[in-house]
Amino acid sequence: MAAKIRQNDEVIVLAGKDKGKRGKVTKVLPNGKVVVEGINIITKHEKPVPALGKAGGLVKKEAAIDASNVAIFNPETNKADRVGFRFEDGKKVRFFKSNEKTI
């Protein structure tokens, strides 16, 4: 099945502590989660690894968020939108449901 949200899509968060924030999808995970730039920041405590020259400490990084909690952002309407699929010239393409524009 084709993915409705793909890497480099601009999305808006629908639920959770970052509700209403926008960001670019940096990674799509196979378990139905996405990593969004600047969203769902966690603080991870890392141990130092002298053999690799890694310093320990607190590291802030982006955690995965469920794909159902984000929606693709439509720049023309400035709102979250739904995604549909159709065939154009024998290729399957995604389009915004609100204004039928190809993504």
UniProtKB/Swiss-Prot annotation:
UniProt keyword list: Ribonucleoprotein, Ribosomal protein, RNA-binding, rRNA-binding
Gene from which this protein is expressed: rplX
This protein's record includes keyword Glycoprotein: no
InterPro entries referenced in this protein's UniProt entry, alphabetically: KOW, Rib_uL2_dom2, Ribosomal_uL24, Ribosomal_uL24_CS, Ribosomal_uL24_KOW, Translation_prot_SH3-like_sf
Keyword hit for Acetylation: no
GO BP: translation
One cellular component term from this protein's GO annotations in UniProt: ribonucleoprotein complex
Family, similarity comment: Belongs to the universal ribosomal protein uL24 family.
Complex and partners: Part of the 50S ribosomal subunit.
Role noted for this protein: One of two assembly initiator proteins, it binds directly to the 5'-end of the 23S rRNA, where it nucleates assembly of the 50S subunit. One of the proteins that surrounds the polypeptide exit tunnel on the outside of the subunit.
Taxonomy, superkingdom: Bacteria
GO molecular function: rRNA binding; structural constituent of ribosome
The protein's name: Large ribosomal subunit protein uL24
One Pfam assignment: KOW
Annotated HAMAP family: Ribosomal_uL24_B (MF_01326_B)
